[in-house]
């Protein structure tokens, strides 16, 4: 586990992300993937590792915790412990044809926060959480 506010190398952070994803039964062996899929997987792993490198995120077993850039009252961090069917069904609550709202509903549900809380986050925080959604949805 990476301790908060401790900066680590890119390689170590990416290794933590790979271990986290493997713990959730997500294949991260890019040697067996098509070139385009491997490139996309590596880009997502790098994006998820960046907050770890900067000490803003931690991984503890099967839990990824992101410290928010702009805390919202008591909400100072958001944790993700895996994707559930419940998170997927949240997208149906969004208006038909509004892809961003559908993605936001899924991200909010997977992090167990409200859609309103998600909407108040800086785009940088949303993009980290959206990358988690992408990798879990593609599994």
Give the ranges of each region predicted by the language model.
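A hydrophobic, small-residue-rich beta->alpha segment in the mid-to-C-terminal subdomain
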Residues: 86-110
